[in-house]
Amino acid sequence: MSAPTPETADNSDSARSSLEALRTEIAKAVVGQDPAVTGLVVALLCRGHVLLEGVPGVAKTLLVRALAASLELGTKRVQFTPDLMPSDITGSLVYDARTAEFSFQPGPVFTNLLLADEINRTPPKTQSSLLEAMEERQVTVDGTPRPLPEPFLVAATQNPVEYEGTYPLPEAQLDRFLLKLTVPLPTRQDEINVLTRHAEGFNPRDLHAAGVRPVAGPADLEAARAAVAKTSVSPEIAGYVVDICRATRESPSLTLGVSPRGATALLSTARAWAWLTGRDYVIPDDVKALALPTLRHRVQLRPEAEMEGVTPDSVITAILTHVPVPR
């Protein structure tokens, strides 16, 4: 592999600094939740989409809004409700009486960063309207394909399935999300910090007043993606990823293991994480760091395992413990 030129290295370092600065900006609005912030940045680098899951009130929506405010990108929000229609997301043809013609009115999906809020509160038919947009980066209305802007990222939030009024996401749609990030309740100290901020006048609806500013733009993102694409992967690392994913298919606790698409996703996220940490090659720790968020939504538990308290995370963690690590 040829050595990078000084100019290429400078561009890569500048892009890395810009994306690292996102953390600082988001921290002005969101206390803690660093793993979720990291996951959002990784998804941007991998051209992927993110599902954020947590109980109501843990700043899932605020986290995505802070990311949008930190980027020089267009953003729109859709609040998913039981009566939301697919055309409310993709857009529709509207009759213009003056011209006696139908014209296309784009829906909120025509943006760079789409916040799909509480995506599991709407029926599957509407959920599936995002499928083509997420996978093909286009929507088809009245037989006409319409490309979406680039970059395009769907950041969806959902409440745990056991909450009233939720619809489990179809497996096909879950697989379209690069990462599923769990947003836990804050620690005691983080919760104290949240209350202190609010007592000092923090308004989550006014991120500009909180000091959140754009620190990265499309050019930074393209430079970063180009650098990630050059991050090298040894045959041993590729084999390690495959062994982890094949082990999920053989687990007695699972009815559904990770597909080859999931293995590709794990390798992609590991490369992005390696680059973010300052390396141009992937090591096993990069794979381990992204295994849970990349794989937890791509496996399905057997009912008897679920009744015994087994979770996708515990199965994947056990697999990481037993699969031999390349040296």
What do these predicted ranges mean?
Residues 13-58, 246:
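Pre-Walker A (pre-P-loop) alpha-helix and adjacent loop at the N terminus of AAA/AAA+ ATPase modules
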Residues 96-101, 122, 134-231, 271-273:
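Canonical AAA+ ATPase core
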Residues 44-81:
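Walker A/P-loop
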Residues 2-9, 65, 242, 248-327:
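C-terminal engagement/docking regions of AAA+ P-loop ATPases
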Residues 54, 117-118, 129:
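Walker B catalytic acidic pair
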